[in-house]
Amino acid sequence: MIYWLHRIFHVVPILKEIHLVHHRHVTLGTGSNKWNWKHMFLWVDDWKGTVDQWLMEIIPTIIFCWVFNQWWLLAFYWFWTAFVQERIEHNKNFNIYPILSSGKWHLVHHRNCNVNYGVFFPIWDILFRTDSKLD
């Protein structure tokens, strides 16, 4: 689901404008994005980054948890977002592809917005031919 939402956020003009702020805010490849107490309240960078996170990940996660009555997933997602995500997703030294679409994988997406949309698993990019080899 997040794969398709991520692709939509690169196509629909208003969503693209909001999402591309995330691409500009990331310290590309250094893994130096420090934890901030605001992350505990799911606030990311600025209002556009926060709207991006809520529309693409948080609200869909809440809906999924409600539909399937799997509220543990919301707790896991909160922990992931508040404490782990920035240290893995934007860290070029964290690479466990093809198991997970980790730091190196995601940073390729930041350089080329037409590839590597997957957030956790690269299988969706491989299936829909939007994967790009790591450099």
Feature names for model-found ranges:
Residues 1-135:
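Membrane-embedded catalytic scaffold of the fatty acid hydroxylase/desaturase
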